[in-house]
Every structure is written in structure tokens, then in C-alpha cells.
Amino acid sequence: NTVWPGTLTGDQKPQLSLTAFELASKASQSVDAPSPWSGRFWGRTRCSTDAAGKFSCETADCGSGQVACNGAGAVPPATLVEITIAANGGQDYYDVSLVDGFNLPMSVAPQGGTGECKPSSCPANVNMACPAQLQVKAADGSVISCKSACLAFGDSKYCCTPPNDTPETCPPTEYSEIFEKQCPQAYSYAYDDKNSTFTCSGGPDYVITFCP
């Protein structure tokens, strides 16, 4: 299936020259990022253009009305790959995050570099295990994405917002455990960094795969 990847640069920095594009099955696309750089990548699915020429997607839409996202982020639920590229070949950080929910499997793997440089992947279709309260369904009744408990319920115990804004006051919940069980390498909620953050040094390239 075709996906429409999007990119978002963080920290109020200029966007990449490519903020989104169409990606056919088995195809690849190179995206240049400067160093240092920090941002995220995601994949939109079930996209179409209406009679008026407005482009939109049923999952992870960026609301721009066109294929390019132009500095707009994904509307959750959306699986995210987050990458922080260090200056001068220093230590990069990267992860797959389900903190904003899940819409499709993703992985990120460094090519080259030094240090750990292990791939991080969420290969499971979490939609198949998504509890009813978190499901987002298409018109035909199929589950097309899975909300985070924070998005579904807005409660600070799920969102890790004050007063529950420390690892001690925001432990895993039954909902984040579902994500954790499906994709143990991914961030399942805000304070899940024990086994979810990956590092690599020496200026590697990164290969991001949708539906690995």
C-alpha cells in the first residue's frame, strides 16, 4: 500500500526541504537533514484528493490540504520516528514512539556510525490488539488507528502532565502495557525510556521503514 510520509523539524528550526511526499510500496525516498537537527517522521494512510482538490488522509493527517505538510505535525493517533542528530558526528538519539498512538508499523535503523547503533522497530500491527475505547475506525468498520490513553481520556495519569509529571507519579498503565507488549522497543508512554531510546555516533544515515 502507498503511504504519504511527513516530516516535522522541532525546536522552532527551519523545516526540511521535503516536508512530505508520496511513497509507493517498495519505493524509497532520500531526505536530507542538517546537523544538528531534531524532528520526527510519520506515515499518513488512506489519503485522497476530493473534487475541490483538497488532499486529506484518514490517519496521521497534517491538515495542510495538500501532500506537503509545510511545518504541520501529524494529527494523532500516529506512529512516530523521532531522531535527534548531533553536531559534528556526536551522539544521535532515535526511537519509535507510540506516545501519540499508533497508525502503522515503523522502524528506524542507522546505516554506518559507531557505538550501539541498533535498529528500533515497532513491526506489529497494534490496531489488531487495540482495545475498543482506543479504536479509530474507517467507514467500513475496520480499525485504522489506535489512540493513546492520553488522547482518549485526557487524564494526567495517562498523559504524565501535572500533578503526574514525574516517572514516579506516572507509571505504566494497562493501556501503555498493551503498546509495550506489542512493540517492546517503542516508547509506549512519556516515561518509557528504559529500553526505548537508541543511540549512535559518527554521523550515520538512517533508514526509516513503513510496515517493516
Swiss-Prot record:
Disulfide bonds join C47-C57, C62-C69, C117-C200, C122-C183, C130-C146, C150-C159, C160-C170. SMART domains: THN. Keywords: Disulfide bond, Secreted. It is found in: Secreted. It holds the Pfam family Thaumatin. Its main location: secreted. It comes from the Eukaryota. SUPFAM superfamilies: Osmotin, thaumatin-like protein (SSF49870). The keyword Ribosomal protein does not apply. GO terms for cellular component: extracellular region. The keyword Cell membrane does not apply. PROSITE patterns: THAUMATIN_1 (PS00316), THAUMATIN_2 (PS51367). Belongs to the thaumatin family. This is Thaumatin-like protein 1b.
